[in-house]
From Swiss-Prot:
Belongs to the pyridoxamine 5'-phosphate oxidase family. One of its GO terms (molecular function) is pyridoxamine phosphate oxidase activity. Pathway: Cofactor metabolism; pyridoxal 5'-phosphate salvage; pyridoxal 5'-phosphate from pyridoxamine 5'-phosphate: step 1/1; Cofactor metabolism; pyridoxal 5'-phosphate salvage; pyridoxal 5'-phosphate from pyridoxine 5'-phosphate: step 1/1. The gene is pdxH. This is Pyridoxine/pyridoxamine 5'-phosphate oxidase. Keywords: Flavoprotein, FMN, Oxidoreductase, Pyridoxine biosynthesis. FMN binds at R71, S72, V73, L74, C75, K76, F86, T87, K93, Q115, Q150, S151, W196, R206. Catalyzes the oxidation of either pyridoxine 5'-phosphate (PNP) or pyridoxamine 5'-phosphate (PMP) into pyridoxal 5'-phosphate (PLP). SUPFAM superfamilies: FMN-binding split barrel. Substrate binds at R13, V14, E15, Y16, K76, Y133, R137, S141, R202, V203, H204.
Amino acid sequence: MAGPDDQHLSGMRVEYGSVEKDGSPDLDTDWLYDGWLTLFCKWIDDAERAGVAEPNAMVLATVANGRPVSRSVLCKGADEAGIIFFTNYDSDKGDDLAATPYASVTFPWYQLGRQVHIRGPVSTVDPQVSEDYWSKRPRGSQLGAWASHQSRPIASRTALLDQLLEVTVRFADSELIPLPPNWGGYLIVPEVVEFWQGRENRVHNRIRVTGGCIERLQP
């Protein structure tokens, strides 16, 4: 049965750019001959300069009991080895990755008509990497990580704030808050990286990098 907003939703449409329309160059395989990382970092920088909120936000998809689950997280590192993010290892995503250490992430920069999709095996990072990042987090974020038993049910927001107050008091005299034993980073090692650029008439540009192979894909 059609909902009251179906007609409105079906009519939503954004027209993408083109060389002729706005001078934006077409994504080309030549841009990727030195690997995926240079263009990826450039697109992150472009998104930041364009005022995109949280240009390092990515949609992380994991598998739970054979069923996909997705959520938004923040990328906190990118190099030739892969993409790094941090979380509670006892969270739902941590449980998923313990059972199936493979994931995909998508960086959607809607304002620019671009996205990058990356997928590959996942492993926990070296504990020192987690320590280094943890030491740079704001104190409030550190307290929040200690307070939250991530993904577990709780009776109310008041109860959650009570937990935050408890850890705030516990660490009140501590200049440095220690890294929780169940908190740290994951590394996604790129097996496949796909760059997508929206183009006029939905004839989009898609280029996939798999190892040393660079392929243009039909939209």
